[in-house]
Amino acid sequence: YGMVKPSPDCTPSPNSGWLPMPERVDGFAQVHVSGTGGGPKYGNVLVTPFGDGMDRVNHYDYRKYETIRLGYYDTQFKQSGIRTEITTSNRASFYRFTYPEDSLKSLAVDAGFFLGENPVPDAREAQQFVGSEIQVLSDHEVAGYTRIRGGWNNGKAYTVYFYAETDRPFVQSLTWKGNRITEAQSQYDSAEKTGALLRFAKNDKVVQLKVGISFLSMQKAKFNAHSEIPHWSFEKVHQDLLGQWEQLFQKIEIDPSTPLAKKRMFYTGLYHTCLLYTSPSPRDCS
């Protein structure tokens, strides 16, 4: 319930990003919609934990299992053994990555990824890449934007700005433009896809990540991340989100004597009515 809706993004890519196992996972993007019909929309700012070398930009994997609850997602990759847990605030995603002891600890941030890419230029209801930018700001921070057009509404170009911060420092950071990986710490917009590869220390088994999103600026994305999640407690973020859902569910009460099956059906329907809430809110539009 909010502007940020993190999800695994699978191939072939559906509108909501997620597909059942055994489809592969390209990573976890921050902005999604579901139930729209038509061509895919959004699927922006992909983050992917990986455990091998920093010599390629794509690091897809397959799920060993999935656990999905209200406000919480958990999976483990088969090949790398990396566990990913996700929860959110309204405008910021929160991740907890747990790496195997003997694994390299790395993370890719892809500013150019989006759902529904079609090799046919201007294919009906396909999204098309317009531009992207990424900057490594410090040994904890990465920021940038992605600009995409098209999708189910054949819409004009939109820009999603992001700010990503980890609780552990990078010991190495590279960036890419197209498929060219370099030691440069910034890649500016020149109509090619950009991203960053981040390496953590060998003993950093658990790495946490905040990703703030804004449709206005990178500064707003940073503000959203810091104001909504000013700490590093995964459990607190999840509990705060559950509290928000409880407030929504309490808006409509049904007779306590209603059979459990009907209660479940009713509140599931009420939950579904809230899934497409994506308003940036006055704070992000001022």
Task: Please place each PLM-identified region on the residue numbering.
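Accessory carbohydrate-recognition regions in carbohydrate-active enzymes
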Residues: Y1-S279, R283-S286
